[in-house]
Amino acid sequence: MDKYLNSFVDHLSEWSSRAFRNNSSSANQSASNKELEQVFEQINAIVENHNNKLTTAFDKISYRVAHKITHLVESHSLVFNYATLVLIASALVVIGSFTSISSIPFTALPPTREHSLFDPTDFDVDHDCHVIYRENDEDKKKKKKSKRFFDMMDEKHAIILPLTSGCTLLALYFVIKKLHLNWLKYVVKILNFNITLLNIPAGTFVYSYFLNSLFRNLSHLASWNPLVVLPRYRVTIADDNEDLNKIGGFVTNLNYKDGLTNSVVHKKTLDEIEKDHWMKHFYRRELVEPKDIKSKRQISNMYLNSALIVSFVLSIVSTVYFYLSPNDWLISNAVSMNMAIWSIAQLKLKNLKSGALILIALFFYDICFVFGTDVMVTVATNLDIPVKLSLPVKFNTAQNNFNFSILGLGDIALPGMFIAMCYKYDIWKWHLDHDDTEFHFLNWSYVGKYFITAMVSYVASLVSAMVSLSIFNTAQPALLYIVPSLLISTILVACWNKDFKQFWNFQYDTIEVDKSLKKAIEKKENSITYSTFILSEYYNDADKYALLGDDVNENFDDDEEFVQEEDLSDSSEEELSEEDLLDDESS
């Protein structure tokens, strides 16, 4: 396989070299190209010198930490290094699984303020589940593009994901092997710039989750008011074309008062302003109660809390530092951790069937590019971008730098999305077994057997990969150990508990029903909310338990019978209405 791959890359390099030679055929063009290269080199030298001055202190910290880690590795062999990698990877998967909850399951009730486990962050997830109608083959042919209310990875991604990943790897391999070193630097800078931009939303998401989770649990344990610890804000942009207030000034509204405000302090502040003539003039508009902002005057609203503000600032700081010093292994690891957690939260598997197919496809993809070729090893070791976890092993005195042991983010994010799906099934199953229970983040009963089984299997498979690496002293595809361990253990537990069929086809926040319901309810939309569905006259207790079972279509064996029953009910209603009219006329 290496032979065919190298020949393919050679053909590409010949074609690119011919193109470069044709573009620079004349002597004037070659001279101008050299001048441009010199200008770019001078600019890069100036920027690098400027960055070195700004990041000298941070580089010293990184080097000191790296030297201490290498000292620990030398004194404890590679056990310390491998154990650290396994611990970090496992922690990222656990955190990513917790952050993947963006809605409540349709088996749960929405959270309420009166519950003992309530926290304001319970309202930060979607409460509306969706009821969608199954489409037959004819409908799928008519609708080439169907609107979806959720973005989940299904069976088709088992083909798309390995193909796109393989094309990306081959493109990077071609850049490393055949293009000039300067071109490789530009490619790395472009990739780092893209990751720098992505780190802003990823870092904000991760840091916000940490702060919200920390203060959520502290407020519950210490019986604090969570709205005092993490107050929530609403920033409204509205037009003032109707009231026409005086322009200028940013003054605190003194009439702001709610249950959290100390009334004594509020009254004391107003008395002090009334006594001071200058202060009274300054707050002259704020002493009068401002008019309410009508909804039709509100241009946009932004909802946030103090944790989100702090997280955004931390994300900006880490992004700027990574931009100034992209080669620092500490900040590179921090950015990689943000990307890993964010990826697990965004990659949502539909059910066990889609997760198993995608992992099996990636299993063969990983083996092909690690054992069959040197593509993955070459790209991972030559591109210094934050798509891997790296820990220093020893200091190379000849090259005056550190040698690192690495673990790709794909070995964290891809199994992580499967483990997150197991965690969602535990939540879904817990509410199914406990009727009429509300969803709350503080409910630690959500950590169930499938999530624990998947995590134990993941840790065991990572340890097996590390042991094989130390024995054979060659790069090991971690998915070779992770995929069989995850699938076999999860499926065995599901079969043992007789949940396999349910787990194989379940959907966390979406209910699929037969299309006959669409005719009965007479809705033109492709989906309705769960709350609307349960309030409809076609939903009774028998239908409720059928929806939670294996197949909804069992209650709708024959569409004609269902329509006939509907017609009979309509006719009976008509007869009743005629009798009522006759009674009214006689009276």
From Swiss-Prot:
List the Lumenal topological domains: 1-85, 178-192, 325-328, 373-401, 472-475
- Record's keyword terms, sorted: Endoplasmic reticulum, Hydrolase, Membrane, Protease, Transmembrane, Transmembrane helix
Q: Where are the transmembrane segments?
A: 86-106, 157-177, 193-213, 304-324, 329-349, 352-372, 402-422, 451-471, 476-496
Q: Does the keyword Endoplasmic reticulum apply?
A: yes
An example Gene Ontology molecular-function term: aspartic endopeptidase activity, intramembrane cleaving
Cytoplasmic topological domain ranges are 107-156, 214-303, 350-351, 423-450, 497-587
Q: Give Gene Ontology CC terms.
A: cytoplasmic side of endoplasmic reticulum membrane; lumenal side of endoplasmic reticulum membrane; perinuclear endoplasmic reticulum membrane
First-listed, main subcellular location of the protein, grouped into a coarse class: membrane
Q: Which residues form a coiled coil?
A: none
Residue ranges annotated as motif PAL: 477-479
Q: Which domain of life is it from?
A: Eukaryota
Q: Note down the stretches annotated as region Disordered.
A: 561-587
Active site (catalytic residues): D366, D411
Record's subcellular location: Membrane; Endoplasmic reticulum membrane
Q: Name one GO biological process term.
A: proteolysis involved in protein catabolic process
What membrane topology does the UniProt entry give? Answer: Multi-pass membrane protein
Disulfide bridge map: none
Give the matching InterPro entries: Peptidase_A22B_SPP (IPR007369), Preselin/SPP (IPR006639)
- What task does this protein carry out? May act as intramembrane protease.
Report the family membership. Belongs to the peptidase A22B family.
Descriptive protein name:
Probable intramembrane protease YKL100C
> To which species is this protein native?
Saccharomyces cerevisiae (strain ATCC 204508 / S288c)
Q: What is the lineage of its organism?
A: Eukaryota, Fungi, Dikarya, Ascomycota, Saccharomycotina
